[in-house]
Amino acid sequence: LIPAILIMLTSLGISFVRPIFVLFVETLDINKNYLPTITGALYSIVGVFSVFSAYWWGKKVESFGLQKSIVVASILTATMYLLHAFITNPYYLIPVRTFLGFGYGALMPLLFTRISNNVNKDRRGGVLGIGSSFQVMGNLVGPLLGGYAGAAIGFSYSFFFTAAIFLLIAIAGYASLRD
């Protein structure tokens, strides 16, 4: 159950800032005519590096360990969200979003691997289905909470809160997920 909850928290954290990200980028010093293009590119950076990092993490997990990989990826993701709160120049978002993608690309595959490794083959499909349901729940709740938080407490605090979610994942991953 703990890996499924961590999957939900990861999805929640990933989707938490989606409703406010365009508004956040708009506050930076950019040409407003290019706002959709710039925001789309900044989202794409995360996606591209997630794809490449998933492969890299998959190779490294054998030597590094599953628990340690989850903790490191969560801390990396938390750190990148924390940096978002202090960014005033849109060009600084490029490396931050790159490393954010590197952390993202690890978390979901690692958490699903954790579930898969600890369940009998005859129960694996059902348990992975539960994990997927928790992922969907996080994707549904995250934008709702994120939009509310962005309006209520502001963009910077929303990034702090998201960083705290990923630190919680790191702590829970360290405390409860043993290799």
Question: What does each of the following model-derived ranges do?
Answer:
Residues 1-17, 98-99:
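Pair of pore-lining "gating" transmembrane helices in MFS-fold secondary transporters
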Residues 52-66, 150:
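Helix-to-loop junctions at the C-terminal end of transmembrane segments
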Residues 68-83:
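Structural signature of the two symmetry-related core transmembrane helices
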Residues 106-119:
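Intracellular juxtamembrane helix-capping segments at the cytosolic ends
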